[in-house]
């Protein structure tokens, strides 16, 4: 029997919380989450992974690019994911900067749809095609494989800059 992929969602706000629930409901992954708000983690029943994860979804706001990059790099160092997927809205070039500084596989995949409730966001996640912009071909392939395994429609674009501008 194949071992389930370990997936970590950083941030349990409207986007991260919705993505976390979609991942859990699929039954295809061992899903963990981290949020600065311990109550959000309790409500979600989220655990913290030990050791390496296969996929790390970043769903934290990027108010300050420098702080965002620093924070994500710390999580990459701690959890050593095979692929990090940035779901956050970030300035163009942020995903490439993370790739250069971490030397890990990183892709950007913006969340599409109307952000009006968690249930609606889950519906939107399943409804829309997930655009993926990798920092290289391997990153794009790892991210697209993960989202396809989740049962989502996927379209790989030319680069992370293209999805960051979406």
PLM feature spans:
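NAD(P)+-binding Rossmann beta1-loop-alpha1 motif at the extreme N-terminus of oxidoreductases
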Residues: 1-51
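Short glycine/serine/threonine-rich phosphate/pyrophosphate-binding segments
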Residues: 17-19, 68, 93-95
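Nucleotide donor/acceptor-binding cores
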Residues: 4-5, 55, 82, 128
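Rossmann-fold dinucleotide-binding core
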Residues: 89-159
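Rossmann-like NAD(P)-binding element
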Residues: 47-83
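Segments forming oxygen-rich coordination pockets for charged ligands
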Residues: 161-166
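A short helix->loop->beta-strand "cap" motif at the edges of active sites that frequently abuts
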Residues: 28, 79-83, 103-104
């Amino acid at each position: 029997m194949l071992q389930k992929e370990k997936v970590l969602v950083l941030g349990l706000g409207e986007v991260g919380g919705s993505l976390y629930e979609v991942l859990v409901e699929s039954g295809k992954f061992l899903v963990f989450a981290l949020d600065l708000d311990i109550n959000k983690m309790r409500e979600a029943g989220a655990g913290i992974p030990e050791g390496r994860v296969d996929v790390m979804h970043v769903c934290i706001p990027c108010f300050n690019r420098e702080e965002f990059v620093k924070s994500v790099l710390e999580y990459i160092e701690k959890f050593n994911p095979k692929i990090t997927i940035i779901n956050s809205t970030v300035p163009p070039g942020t995903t490439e900067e993370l790739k250069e500084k971490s030397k890990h596989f990183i892709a950007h995949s913006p969340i599409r749809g109307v952000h009006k409730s968690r249930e609606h966001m889950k519906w939107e996640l399943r409804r829309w095609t997930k655009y993926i912009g990798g920092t290289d071909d391997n990153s794009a392939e790892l991210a697209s494989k993960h989202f396809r395994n989740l049962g989502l429609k996927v379209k790989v674009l030319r680069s992370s800059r293209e999805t960051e501008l979406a």
